[in-house]
Amino acid sequence: MASQGTKRSYEQMETGGERQNATEIRASVGRMVGGIGRFYIQMCTELKLSDYEGRLIQNSITIERMVLSAFDERRNKYLEEHPSAGKDPKKTGGPIYRRRDGKWMRELILYDKEEIRRIWRQANNGEDATAGLTHLMIWHSNLNDATYQRTRALVRTGMDPRMCSLMQGSTLPRRSGAAGAAVKGVGTMVMELIRMIKRGINDRNFWRGENERRTRIAYERMCNILKGKFQTAAQRAMMDQVRESRNPGNAEIEDLIFLARSALILRGSVAHKSCLPACVYGLAVASGYDFEREGYSLVGIDPFRLLQNSQVFSLIRPNENPAHKSQLVWMACHSAAFEDLRVSSFIRGTRVVPRGQLSTRGVQIASNENMETMDSSTLELRSRYWAIRTRSGGNTNQQRASAGQISVQPTFSVQRNLPFERATIMAAFTGNTEGRTSDMRTEIIRMMESARPEDVSFQGRGVFELSDEKATNPIVPSFDMSNEGSYFFGDSAEEYDN
């Protein structure tokens, strides 16, 4: 990992805090999730949800979306200035599912945003608690990462669909702050930058005019976030070039796409956090658990332990497989959409299959779907072991590049090799090494060529028994070295549409 001395830990970003010691961090993260739990309980009371209905993940998602919408100042302002038919800018709502006479019913509810904000603040000691809101955004983003593919978005920006493993956090809203930036993949940042540059190419006044400074600052900030994700000097130097460009255009887009491709082997550092649905925190608070006193961490044993003792339900469509639905939500809870399936399977204790083999669609139910045939089942979110979440890309030998896998961005700090098809990746780098970044490009290609697929990442790191909360006895799994495990092979997922 690049020297983290100057960076705040991602729990600090998550809670908006300055430097704190471990105990203070655990307490402030605990306060954050405890606030989410209290809010959820209060909403269940307001909506008169039964215990079973309150544990339904679809109801949890509706309630989460309502509070996110209530605090979305930019959109609220926009809605007030551009009134659209049938949308009350002061109200928010969504589908709530209730059990009536042995059947599931959908009820559309509407609430004043002001009222939702009041309930949220009340649950969070009168504060806005933006950290808690960001936490919910990251949970939704992790769910999207596991559920949808972004091939169309990749192709639209001129990137290759095989770079899907770099797209973590691609559906996070812009307002998700430092905690959101930490979990965004290299591809996501590249895509945001390319969109911005394309706007500048098409709109002459984008870099000029009254917003000139704000636009420029936003551009440089995004460049710096992306630069911070790269772990080799040459990649960072190329980012400096992109950032300092007077008038960003096609040359910068080329450089960014080159960098994104290089990240398939010279992986960036991307944070992973286990963000759980609000109902899980609600259940714990309701059972008397004091998160702030006990402390909580998003990257250790705590989320695993919470999921061991939580019963969450989901609506199931007629031809869906409940075990597959559980896998989808398990991956989302641990931010493991881009993890090697060999590692995920070992930790979960049951085989985790690629998305192309899942008989399940997304968790959310569209408003035109027939409720008559809906069933519900328990989500199996427990695990056999737990492991520490990582924020490094798993490159071996300090700052040197290691074998990447076209399709993996490690989530868990667990020893494994990262098999990859060098030929497939290198084929993308033929030709263009001229221009002002030529020496950096040459250096990056040289590092990639010297990467070996048999190198071991996270040397000596293992998983832990759920009884081993202090992480004293690592169990280092041995994996079949040849068999790479990408979730995205044979992909048949739907596209993500806003």
Curated annotation (Swiss-Prot):
- Domain of life per record: Viruses
Residues making up the signal peptide according to the UniProt record:
none
**Biological process terms in GO annotation:** symbiont entry into host cell; viral penetration into host nucleus
A GO molecular function assigned to this protein is: structural molecule activity
The protein's PTM annotation reads: Late in virus-infected cells, may be cleaved from a 56-kDa protein to a 53-kDa protein by a cellular caspase. This cleavage might be a marker for the onset of apoptosis in infected cells or have a specific function in virus host interaction.
**Motif extent (Bipartite nuclear localization signal):** 198-216
Question: Which Pfam families does this entry report, sorted A to Z?
Answer: Flu_NP
Name the family the entry cites: Belongs to the influenza viruses nucleoprotein family.
Q: This protein is called what?
A: Nucleoprotein
Q: Which organism is it from?
A: Influenza A virus (strain A/Duck/England/1/1962 H4N6)
* Gene name as annotated: NP
